[in-house]
Amino acid sequence: MKRRAERQKETRQRIVDATVELHRSIGPLRTTISAIAEKAGVERHTYYAHFPELKDLYQACSGHYVVHHPPPDHCSWTELADHEDRLRRALSEVYAYYGHHEEIFANVLRDAQVDALCAKFTNPVFQNWKRTWSDAVAEGWDAEGERDEALLAAIGFALDFQTWNTLVRQQGLDQERAMELMVGMVRCLMRT
């Protein structure tokens, strides 16, 4: 009985791994059940035995990916007293993370724009990261009311995957120049 449970767990993990790889390479919307089953080396009925609904698969894949590819830890950023240094470190770590996971992030965010189920599992993760990171970077900055709102918006914009993608991939800036552009934007905001 124990061996059977282990085999089921291994099969389930192969399905999750196959799905994550397909989401990375082609995106959730282009990933078919047949492709997942083939890549995992299982039959379709085996896939459905483990994941009767697509939401079950998305939940397993999201949890698996975040555990094995954790986002940058914002706690060390608050140790930096200088606000620009704090923002610079955050951008450095977040942009490196985006660069490393660019393919899967671009695919899932693209598909989340047109698929409600994909959005349900993707958007809260990215929104939570951005909110947590923005709060950590903004901590201690002298801003209240509308100015604080603008500061959080600017930092959130700077830390957004689409901003990184636009600056680095579409505009051709290297990560250092993209970071300095965002630091300069926030600096200008805080001087007004």
Which residue stretches match the model-derived regions?
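Basic, helix-initiating cap at the start of DNA-binding domains
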Residues: 1-42, 55-56
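Hydrophobic alpha-helical connector segments
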Residues: 60, 73-103, 126
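Key DNA-contact positions within bacterial/archaeal DNA-binding proteins
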Residues: 45
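Amphipathic alpha-helical packing segments from all-alpha helical-bundle domains
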Residues: 92, 96-109, 116-142, 149-153, ...
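Alpha-helical DNA-contacting segments of helix-turn-helix folds
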Residues: 23, 56-65, 125
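Amphipathic C-terminal alpha-helical segment
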Residues: 135, 152-173, 188-192
